[in-house]
């Protein structure tokens, strides 16, 4: 039996369900999910292995017009990834027509030799007439090998999407062991899980002015518990107060919720300590971005 393997990137506007889709396929919480846009900052590499194929997924930041150095970094990662892969999944969600954000990405995809599959997500929220109308509009662009409707959250039609992807995989080796589902360091995943909870507990302009650095991650000697220290960086003193909350209640909520997810990830009890520090304009500081892993 021949074995197929290859690399697939997932692109799309912020907040269309790219990370939800990848997490549904992999079956583990690897990519950060939030109801706020631009939540994925690093090119997360996840691995899905079956007996006769292996797919390596690259979950890129949403392609958008950048407003700062961090935004430039995110878009650079997303567009460069298109050159490295065997197939591209372009994820869009419900709407009445192709919006300017999706049209911007379509323009970026013109002339790309890599096979592109359009994934219409959130079909559970669309009626048949709207779905058919969108299908026709995207088909007229002429750049998609296939168009498929799914619900990433519910898992509807995701199996058929996988079958489509496998068609474009070349024969190749297992790039990663069967048990491996990501190449990301645990410290980075822990930081992203904490940042997800910050996005959940805060609002307005605060979330995307926030970064998390895991400074300590160590198993206690002779005990089934991992000590984790992490620093939350924000850009304004007022943001620090909002993240901490009255009497520290909001920070405690962030910590408790993050700890529960981290314990599931690591399969161990976790003692999590969080600090909040102000680092003004960190998104435009190349040194700070490099320190936080955005290089």
From Swiss-Prot:
InterPro entries per UniProt: G_ERA_dom, GTP-bd, GTPase_Era-like, KH_dom-like_a/b, KH_dom_type_2, KH_sf_prok-type, P-loop_NTPase, Small_GTP-bd
GO molecular function: GTP binding; GTPase activity; ribosomal small subunit binding; small ribosomal subunit rRNA binding
GO cellular component, one term: plasma membrane
Segments of this protein annotated with the region G1: 12-19
Domain named KH type-2: residues: 194-280
Alphabetical keyword list: Cell membrane, Cytoplasm, GTP-binding, Membrane, Nucleotide-binding, Ribosome biogenesis, RNA-binding, rRNA-binding
Protein topology in the membrane: Peripheral membrane protein
Function: An essential GTPase that binds both GDP and GTP, with rapid nucleotide exchange. Plays a role in 16S rRNA processing and 30S ribosomal subunit biogenesis and possibly also in cell cycle regulation and energy metabolism.
Subunit relationships: Monomer.
Similarity section: Belongs to the TRAFAC class TrmE-Era-EngA-EngB-Septin-like GTPase superfamily. Era GTPase family.
Name of the protein in question: GTPase Era
Provenance organism: Alkaliphilus oremlandii (strain OhILAs)
Gene label: era
């Amino acid at each position: 039996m021949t074995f197929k393997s290859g690399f697939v990137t997932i692109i799309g506007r912020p907040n269309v369900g790219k990370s939800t889709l990848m997490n549904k396929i992999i079956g583990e919480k690897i990519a950060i999910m939030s109801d706020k846009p631009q939540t994925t900052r690093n090119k997360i590499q996840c691995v899905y292995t079956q007996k006769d194929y292996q797919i390596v997924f690259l979950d890129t930041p949403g392609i958008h017009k950048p407003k700062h150095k961090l935004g430039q970094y995110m878009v650079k990662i997303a567009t460069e990834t298109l050159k490295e892969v065997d197939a591209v999944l372009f994820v869009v969600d419900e709407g009445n027509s192709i919006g300017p954000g999706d049209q911007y990405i379509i323009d970026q995809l013109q002339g790309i030799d890599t096979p592109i599959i359009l994934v219409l997500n959130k079909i559970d929220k669309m009626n048949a007439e709207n779905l058919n109308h969108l299908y026709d509009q995207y088909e007229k662009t002429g750049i998609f090998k296939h168009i498929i409707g799914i619900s990433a959250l519910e898992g509807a039609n995701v199996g058929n999407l996988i079958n489509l992807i496998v068609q474009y995989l070349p024969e190749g080796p297992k790039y990663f062991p069967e048990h491996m589902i990501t190449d990301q360091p645990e410290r980075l995943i822990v930081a992203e899980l904490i940042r997800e909870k910050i996005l959940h507990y805060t609002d307005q302009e605060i979330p995307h002015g926030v970064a998390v650095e895991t400074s300590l991650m160590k198993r206690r000697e002779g005990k089934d518990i991992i000590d984790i220290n992490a620093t939350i960086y924000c850009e304004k003193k007022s943001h620090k107060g909002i993240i901490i909350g009255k009497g520290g209640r909001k920070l405690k909520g962030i910590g408790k919720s993050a700890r529960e997810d981290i314990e599931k990830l690591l399969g161990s009890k976790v003692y999590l300590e969080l600090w909040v520090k102000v680092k003004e304009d960190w998104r435009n500081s190349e040194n700070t971005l490099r320190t936080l892993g955005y290089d």
